[in-house]
A protein has these predicted regions:
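Class I SAM-dependent transferase core
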Residues: 1-78, 86-90, 109-112, 117, ...
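Conserved nucleotide-cofactor-binding alpha/beta core module
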Residues: 66, 71-186
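Positively charged
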Residues: 142, 202-203
Length: 203
């Protein structure tokens, strides 16, 4: 798999992603975060299935998402729909001295990802719905929603948990939205051409 991983890293580098994003992808082994039957495809630039209809996004989509998120040292970051924990691990590699929270409604995935990331002391994973965010740990510098929100419906509770200044990245339909809060003013950019599993409200 070493050759396949090197090809992926070269591809991401050629797409212009930052050194810190490339280094995170180099450090974190994707094969540990996918089921055994699809490990052979770990470094193909494709989404792969997880449990109960969940997926792990293709690496180029994750790299683009992280570039929009703009994670920085010392930040508090929340991922909703953290799946197998791959993106949490990448963020942890970039934000080594920050605090990272993952909410995953699928109990099996939450348990597996906790075990995979138990040595990452700056990551905390909770098995619960992300609909209400994580108010007890708010505000967050960054919020990443890793499932498609319905009809441009970013829950207001999440926006209220965003620090000022702060950024939310949220898939809506076939687009990624970058929502930025600065001086109490909220702006939005849309990046079309993506596909995500839908936001699950109940387990």
């Amino acid at each position: 798999m070493i050759v396949q991983k090197e090809k992926l890293l070269i591809s991401l580098k050629n797409q212009g992603y930052s050194d810190e994003i490339i280094k995170a992808f180099a450090k974190i082994d994707r094969e540990f975060f996918v089921p055994d039957q699809v490990k052979i495809y770990s470094y193909d630039d494709i989404a792969l299935p997880l449990d109960d209809g969940s997926t792990i996004s293709q690496p180029s989509t994750i790299a683009f998402t992280l570039s929009l998120l703009e994670p920085k040292q010392g930040q508090s970051i929340l991922e909703i729909g953290s799946g197998s924990g791959y993106v949490l691990a990448l963020i942890s590699e970039i934000v080594k001295n920050g605090k990272i929270y993952g909410l995953e409604i699928n109990q099996n995935l939450a348990i597996k990802s906790k075990k995979l990331l138990e040595k990452n002391l700056n990551i905390e994973i909770l098995n619960r719905s992300g609909l209400e965010g994580l108010p007890e740990q708010a505000p967050f510098d960054r919020i990443l929603i890793s499932a498609s929100c319905p009809d441009r419906g970013i829950p207001y509770s999440l926006l209220s948990q965003l620090r000022d200044p702060g950024i939310i990245i949220a898939p809506v339909g076939t687009s990624l939205l970058k929502i930025r809060k600065i001086n109490k003013i909220v702006s939005e950019e849309e990046f079309p051409g993506f596909s995500f599993v839908p936001f699950v409200l109940k387990s």
